[in-house]
Amino acid sequence: MPLPYVGMALRRLAWAVASCRLAPWTRGASGPLHSAPAARSDCSAPVFIRAPAFGDRLALIDQHGRHTYKDLYLRSLRLSREICQLRACADGDLREERVSLLCSNDVSFVVAQWAAWMSGGVAVPLYRKHPRAQLEYFIQDSRSSVVLAGPEHVELLSPVAQKLGVPLLPLPPTVYHGVAEDPEEGLVLERNWRDRGAMIIYTSGTTGRPKGVLSTHDNIRAVVTGLVHKWAWTKDDVILHVLPLHHVHGVVNKLLCPLWVGATCVMLPEFSAQLVWEKFLSSEAPQINVFMAVPTIYSKLMDYYDKHFTQPHVQDFVRAVCEEKIRLMVSGSAALPLPVLEKWKGITGHTLLERYGMTEIGMALSNPLTAARLPGSVGTPLPGVEVRIVSENPQKDSSPYLIHAEGSEENTKVTPGFEEKEGELLVRGPSVFREYWDKPEETKAAFTSDGWFKTGDTVVFKDGCYWIRGRTSVDIIKSGGYKVSALEVERLLLAHPSITDVAVIGVPDMTWGQRVTAVVTLQEGHSLSHRELKEWARGVLAPYAVPSELLLVEEIPRNQMGKVNKRDLVRQLYPHEKGAPEAGSQ
């Protein structure tokens, strides 16, 4: 290692150590709080273990340039050694200490994530648009022992890290350019990866406070290999990545899958309809042939198309290019409105592949790759995934629930008398998460007594496919691919000096899936406009959680227990809104 780099690294490490006032304690050793069935293979090593075999193949293209698999591996190895040096970890194993990371949508995220894993840590991805208070909560709740930050995020995270007494390690320029000089030392210690914690992703829950979903390396392997098989990933694929990197869709489906098989990922810093269309239609190599997004992005791409591709010959060209070059287009993270699916097919010739998943289970259901897809359905179970549709057993004699249908990749068996009966979806398999971080009671409550994860989603099996009917709980709003906790938004809005009561509801929306709407009562003599509320809320809420609509009412109806029936509230306030709950629905 050249001397200039050594000096720079030591200065950065010294800064990181100096910022640490309190040493975060590590979680005591304990086994998993539930056991998933064994995977088909014990080969649960992380994706970076596969990288050396791909060598000089092109792994990533971003605003910084082109990066090979060898580049990613050696840069990650170098950073992992810095992490271990900072944590005084002589044997190179952090033993599941948490490593928070805030990076842009570029090579820095991959290197930071791989480095966290190489050093034996659990990666905790953060999001730059989250308010500082929420970033502080994630770092503190996960008890991260170090925070990695891209240079553009150091200013945001520095005061947070100092307040919490957690060392902040800015990513060096070598993360973005160059390779290590001593590849003969480029080996990661042998470890038993299978049950080792890999990643904590924070997701909203019905309690309102975000919960950390801890997945193991084997959980991630199960999701990735299932998708690789189902969607026929190969090293020749080139995917365009435009999603944030703090949830499963962006991290696993769009990043780890291509890197698992030696394919190429083209990353944009953020979504731009113009740039996406330019990439689709470009003749430059490598050419995009896979795309995945949330329904909101497809709506925005169609808006751009309507404004800029007005000539018939241009529209014919767009459709021809998309049909010829692109093999797979996927929609997920929120329900796909049928008009969006139909219009997109008319523009590109592609019937969007709909699938179903969530942070706790990865991906569970998917439409077929080549066979006909039923619009609105989410297909059948992925490899290794078992599902059940159930309802409560009123007798509670032999089982706490009644099984309507039970399925796997091979087939689904429906219980006689329960044909096309709705129920809650249960999931079991090696992709199901290990635990809610530091929340044993909530982890236990999330599973049935016989080990199935309760998704909280109402589904039905008909026409050979599974159909999602909606959340069992109305307090999780899916807007633009994000999951928004209505209870958390309510809790924060009640801090506004003019608001006395609030109910946050999800109203069906063509573009966003659901729009976050705040129903509010005010202090006597006070006034509040939607613009004023948005300006105030931006300081405490993520952009996608800021209410897009404000309704002022004299009183919010509550029952004797003080609870709001939000389905009734949506029906009352939006009786003609398409997709609003029907009378009597539960």
Curated annotation (Swiss-Prot):
UniProt cross-references to Gene3D superfamilies, sorted A to Z: 3.30.300.30, N-terminal domain of ligase-like
- GO terms under biological process: fatty acid biosynthetic process
- EC no. given is 6.2.1.76
Under catalytic activity, the entry for this protein gives: tetracosanoate + ATP + CoA = tetracosanoyl-CoA + AMP + diphosphate; malonate + ATP + CoA = malonyl-CoA + AMP + diphosphate
Targeting presequence = 1-89
Where is the protein found, in the record's own terms? Mitochondrion
Key words of the record:
ATP-binding, Fatty acid metabolism, Ligase, Lipid metabolism, Mitochondrion, Nucleotide-binding, Transit peptide
Q: Which residues form the signal peptide?
A: none
Question: Matching PROSITE patterns, A to Z?
Answer: AMP_BINDING
Q: Which residues cross the membrane?
A: none
Q: State what this protein does.
A: Catalyzes the initial reaction in intramitochondrial fatty acid synthesis, by activating malonate and methylmalonate, but not acetate, into their respective CoA thioester. May have some preference toward very-long-chain substrates.
Could you say which protein family the record assigns here?
Belongs to the ATP-dependent AMP-binding enzyme family.
| Protein name (database record) | Malonate--CoA ligase ACSF3, mitochondrial
This chain's source organism reads Bos taurus
